[in-house]
Every structure is written in structure tokens, then in C-alpha cells.
Curated annotation (Swiss-Prot):
Keywords: NAD, Oxidoreductase, Tricarboxylic acid cycle. This is Putative malate dehydrogenase 1B. The keyword Glycoprotein does not apply. Residues 489-500 have a biased composition (Acidic residues). It comes from Mus musculus (Mouse). The gene is Mdh1b. GO terms for molecular function: malate dehydrogenase activity; oxidoreductase activity, acting on the CH-OH group of donors, NAD or NADP as acceptor. Its EC number is 1.1.1.-. Belongs to the LDH/MDH superfamily. MDH type 2 family. Residues 465-500 are annotated as: Disordered. Gene3D superfamilies: Lactate dehydrogenase/glycoside hydrolase, family 4, C-terminal, NAD(P)-binding Rossmann-like Domain. The keyword Oxidoreductase applies. GO terms for biological process: malate metabolic process; tricarboxylic acid cycle.
């Protein structure tokens, strides 16, 4: 059987003439088969050079015709161009072509139009079936190992969304990345299309639609505070440049971890201004810690506690606000209907525990990073992404680090954790909540550290000076007690029913 491949520029008249002759031979000869390849004129030279280099041929003009010896795509024997094919047809089959130049030009024009339409159709189909491009930066950290199964569970992006996962880290972490890739493949997740790793900086975040920034895997703990702050700038500058250059224009960037999360988010926004509105910082980890401490005190589960608000620096000086906090399914003498809840502050009668032990426990957890391990960090990131794509539970308050635009009298230009809700693929700051205004002292304390972090990191301030707290003024404010218009133990806040 004679198997020929005819390739040429889509607008080449000689390709059109060779194609028509080959069609005639295939129609009339039982053992004559052809395969056609058209290339856009702009891509022809690179394509034919690659084919000739691969097969050790010497041919540059259009068309190029070769005979395949065995199977389609297998080893081939170069025949030549149009003239060689015409001579071959005359000698072997006694057939020639009498196509006029005018007809050749008409068919070449039609071929070009058809090629263009087919390419557009291919691009459209590719967009319909292309997987979601997810990148994880600093993927050599242990958090990544806990995060990957959550991303591939189908709960974050949906069971019908396929994922192409790329792990990015420094070159010295290549062995670790290779191991994680193999383990990820072993999961055999139905939503995983491909998984790979990248250690080449210039290729980072290529066509990324979701980027997860974790703590740097090579961070040192021997720096001074000022050195730590300044060391974040080069990496964030690099990431910002790469995201702007390589990522999809609607990329979603989520920053998680336990070290300077607000600062890193601020710097990324500064160095990637075109996608700044799509960069957020994860605060659900701190929120989860606060809920767990409350749950242990109230002898319930942390999942029953809702609407704890985290203000300020997610991984530093923050304010845990319980004024809107609720507990559902609480074991008490009176049981309400589904959706019934109690105010958390109305059920904790030990005010000294709230103002001292609770505050101190959270402060220790925040300052040391203890108990903020891989499981909690991964779950917080995955849950925030799920809310971003599918919306947060109706009526529920979520804490999120976003760029301040002056809401709640917070200075502009800093990333600040505040109450939000997710809906329709974005988030909305809940500025319409009642009785959650912050006192001037509390606001000054929370914003002061964030502003100093940014100034020190950018070299505008040499020394970081933590703002000293006044225990009498600020201990109660950590739970929001001194911010309420009504005392938490009042009858009005004891029991409520939430609209379903």
C-alpha cells in the first residue's frame, strides 16, 4: 500500500494542485492513501525546519511530500515537492494534472479560509475542555502535601472541573517536588488532568488561573525582625513580575501561611498592580484557632461556632471580635428549632477568662505559630478558595485579608483582615454590620504594626517599634466587649433565631 503525506502552506497554490491530484489517485486506486497537513504561512518555516531536522531531510519550500514506510506518523522517505510528486504520479500511475493557474489560486484561497476556520474551532474546543491551571508556589513545604488532596477532592473547584496542577519551588527542592508529583499521581483523582513541577523562574505561573503562595521553604529564623521584613521584598517583587507577565489576566492569587501574610499580600499587590484586586490573604486559620479555644471552653465543637471576626494582622497583632459570634446546637435546658443559636458572649460567664486567658492563648498561638501546622493551613486555604468559587454559606461572616479602601476608618494602602462574604466569584466587605466599629485605640494598635511592617520592608523605616498595649484598655477589647453598645450579658443578646 502506498501511503503519502502532503504538507504545505494553507495558501500555497502548488499544495492545492498536489492535493487535488492526490485526491484523484486515492479515489481511483485501491491501495493509495494520503494524509494532508496544512500550516499557516507564518508558521510554515519553523514547522518544516523541525520536520526536516527530525528526519534528516533537506527541503524548505511548500509543499513537502513524503512516503510513509509502515504506519501513520512513523518512519518516512522524502519524495520532494510538487514537481517530484507530479513526476512520480506520471511514471507510476500514468496520471498528470492539467489544473490552470487561475483554478490553483482559487483553491489556495479556499484552503486558507478553511484552515483559519478549523483553527478557530480547535481553539474554541480547547477552551471548553482545558483544565484549570493551578500553581502552588513554595510547594516543597509540608503544607503543600496536606493541601493537594483537598484541591483534588472535587469540593474546592467542583467535581466537573479538571485541574492541571504545577508545583513551583527553587531548584534545590527538585527531588522533593518530584516525590510530591509521584504521590499526587498515585491519588488517581478523577479531577486531576496533569501534575508537574517547575524550577525554572522564567516559566513560573505560565497561564496560571489560580496561584497559591505558601511560606518560603528556605526561610531562616536567625534574622532580626527588620531583616525578615526586608527579605520578603525580593521574592514578592519577583512573583509580582512573573504573575503579571505569565499568568492569565483573571488569575486568582491567595496568600497563606504563618509568616507576614499581610505584608506579603501588600507587596504582591504593589508589584502586580494589574491583578491587585484578585489577591487576598487567608485569615480562616486564626479564625479556626479562636473557634477551637471557645469550643473547648463551652464544651461543644468548633464547627458549631460561627461569625468570629478577625481584625488586623492575620499572623501578628490582631483583634478577635466576639460581638457577632454565635453558637449553634448548644447543649442547654432549652432547645430551639433548626437555625436557633445563642450569642457566645451571653453563655460565657467567666469574664476574666475572656479578657485574660482567651486573649493570652490566642496571642501565644499567633506570635509563635504553634498549632498552625500543615493541616490547619491547608484546610484554611482550601476553604477560602471554595468560598471564592462557590460562595460562602448564606448569612455567615468570613474573615479575609484584603486591601483597605477606608472601610471602618482603616487607613488605605494596607492589607487588613476584616469581615466579608463571598458571592458570585468575588467578595464583599460587610460594611453594613451594626455595632462592630473599632475604638480609636484598638484601630491605632492594629494599623500601627502593619504600617511599620510595610515601611521597614520598603526601606523607609530602619527600626520596627512594636506599639505597647495598655492592659487596662486593650485586654477587654480583644474580645470586643468594650466595643458593644449593650453589655454582652443583656437579655436582648441571649437567644436569637436566624432566618433560614
Amino acid at each position: 500500500m502506498a501511503k503519502f503525506v502532503i504538507a504545505g502552506k494553507a495558501n500555497c497554490p502548488y499544495y492545492a494542485k498536489a492535493e487535488l491530484l492526490a485526491d484523484y489517485l486515492q479515489k481511483n486506486l485501491p491501495d493509495f492513501r494520503i494524509f494532508k497537513i496544512t500550516q499557516h504561512p507564518d508558521k510554515w518555516e519553523d514547522w518544516v525546519e523541525d520536520v526536516c531536522e527530525r528526519n534528516m531531510w533537506d527541503h524548505r519550500t511548500s509543499p513537502i511530500i513524503w512516503r510513509e514506510l509502515l504506519d501513520r506518523g512513523g518512519r518516512g522517505l522524502l519524495l520532494g515537492g510538487y514537481n517530484e510528486f507530479l513526476e512520480h504520479a506520471q511514471l507510476y500511475y500514468g496520471v498528470t494534472s492539467n489544473m490552470t493557474t487561475e483554478l490553483m489560486m482559487v483553491i489556495a484561497k479556499e484552503n486558507m479560509q478553511t484552515h483559519t476556520e478549523q483553527q478557530l474551532d480547535k481553539e474554541t474546543m480547547k477552551d471548553l475542555i482545558s483544565p484549570l491551571q493551578v500553581w502552588i508556589a513554595s510547594a516543597g513545604t509540608y503544607v503543600c502535601c496536606h493541601l493537594i488532596p483537598l484541591l483534588l477532592s472535587g469540593e474546592v473547584f467542583g467535581m466537573h472541573t479538571e485541574i492541571s496542577l504545577t508545583l513551583f519551588d527553587q531548584e534545590q527542592r527538585e527531588d522533593c517536588l518530584r516525590s510530591i508529583v509521584m504521590e499526587t499521581q498515585d491519588l488517581a483523582s478523577p479531577v486531576l488532568r496533569t501534575v508537574s513541577f517547575c524550577t525554572t523562574v522564567k516559566e513560573a505561573f505560565l497561564q496560571a488561573q489560580v496561584i497559591i503562595i505558601l511560606d518560603d521553604s528556605t526561610e531562616e529564623e536567625v534574622y532580626s525582625l527588620e531583616s525578615c521584613l526586608r527579605s520578603r521584598v525580593p521574592l514578592c517583587r519577583l512573583y509580582g513580575y512573573l504573575i503579571e507577565k505569565n499568568a492569565h489576566k483573571s488569575v486568582k492569587v491567595i496568600v497563606g501561611g504563618k509568616n507576614f501574610v499581610n505584608l506579603k499580600t501588600t507587596l504582591l499587590m504593589q508589584y502586580a498592580p494589574n491583578i491587585a484586586s484578585n489577591i487576598i490573604a487567608v485569615a480562616l486559620g486564626v479564625e479556626g484557632q479562636a473557634k477551637a479555644v471557645l469550643a473547648r471552653k463551652m464544651k461543644t465543637t468548633s464547627a458549631n461556632i460561627k461569625d468570629v471576626i478577625i481584625w488586623g494582622n492575620i499572623t501578628g497583632n490582631n483583634y478577635v471580635d466576639l460581638r457577632k459570634a454565635k453558637v449553634y446546637n448548644y447543649e442547654s435546658a432549652v432547645k430551639g428549632p433548626p437555625g436557633h443559636y445563642h450569642s457566645v458572649l451571653s453563655l460565657i460567664f467567666d469574664r476574666e477568662w475572656i479578657t485574660k486567658e482567651f486573649v493570652q492563648t490566642l496571642k501565644i498561638l499567633s506570635s509563635t505559630g504553634k498549632q498552625f501546622g500543615g493541616i490547619l493551613a491547608a484546610h484554611s486555604i482550601a476553604t477560602t478558595l471554595k468560598y471564592w468559587y462557590h460562595g460562602s454559606p448564606p448569612g455567615e461572616i468570613v474573615s479575609l485579608g484584603v486591601m483597605s479602601e477606608g472601610q471602618f476608618d482603616i487607613p488605605e494602602g494596607i492589607v487588613f483582615s476584616m469581615p466579608v462574604k463571598f458571592e458570585n466569584g468575588t467578595w464583599v466587605v460587610l460594611t453594613d454590620l451594626e455595632d462592630i466599629s473599632l475604638s480609636e485605640k484598638t484601630l491605632s494598635r492594629l494599623t500601627g504594626d502593619l504600617i511599620q511592617e510595610k515601611l521597614v520592608a520598603c526601606g523607609d523605616l530602619l527600626t520596627f517599634q512594636p506599639i505597647e498595649e495598655d492592659p487596662k484598655d486593650n485586654e477587654p477589647s480583644n474580645t470586643g466587649m468594650n466595643e458593644e453598645k449593650e453589655q454582652p450579658g443583656s437579655d436582648d443578646s441571649d437567644e436569637k433565631n436566624e432566618d433560614q
